[in-house]
Amino acid sequence: MKAEILFPEVCNLYGDLQNIYYLKRCCPALEIIETDLHSKPRFLTEDVALVYMGSTTEQGLRLAADALRPYAADIAAKADAGQLILLTGNAPDVFSDAIESDSADTIEGLGILPGRVRYTMMKRHNSFFLGTFDGMEVVGFKSLFGFHYDAPERGGWFRITRGVGRTPESKLEGFCRGGLYATALIGPLLILNPPLCKW
């Protein structure tokens, strides 16, 4: 069984990569593939159980978007066919239509997830999160510069109990599309939520 980490050289903030290394400790037979920015993602041509991409810097977002853009249609098709893809932190922003910022040029996203992300760099949001999914509670942390706008209020991953969602007003957090699960929660998501990890 294989798990692929996309771009660990830049998508490595907040200890997000420990989500995958935790799985390796739970299942020593798991083979971890680390795909760099200059390589085609292996899950597009090989059997990979889980694809993971974590948080990165604003420059890292641009690099990741540029690296994945040639494969956007193939990634969307794989997700729709059930390929398990987990995106945490600001990684989902790359998969949106675009990332707009008050202090940088707009980054064209992959258009796999709906809506646009708007960053206000001097208004960082930090909070705890409590939500529900499939009968279980999910806890986590958020630290972000912006929110997802112009996305329909459906297709979320978690329902909010406390904290904020895609926008401060939304009751949904994250996105689901086929086998793609995306959340703005950062850090050891799977370690903090064993039932979610088992799911």
Regions found by a protein language model. Name each.
Residues 1-80, 191-198:
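N-terminal beta1-alpha1 cap of cysteine-dependent amidohydrolase-like domains
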Residues 34, 86-89, 142, 184:
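A structural signal for short, well-ordered beta-strand segments and their strand-loop junctions
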Residues 47-48, 81-83, 105-108, 136-138, ...:
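Short coil/turn connectors at secondary-structure junctions
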Residues 50-54, 86, 182-184:
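Structural motif
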Residues 56-132:
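Cysteine-nucleophile active-site neighborhood
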Residues 58-59, 92-94, 147-149, 189-191:
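Glycine-rich nucleotide phosphate-binding loop and flanking beta-alpha elements
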Residues 102-174:
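Pocket-forming structural segment of enzyme catalytic cores
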Residues 166-199:
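A glycine-centered loop/beta-turn motif at secondary-structure junctions
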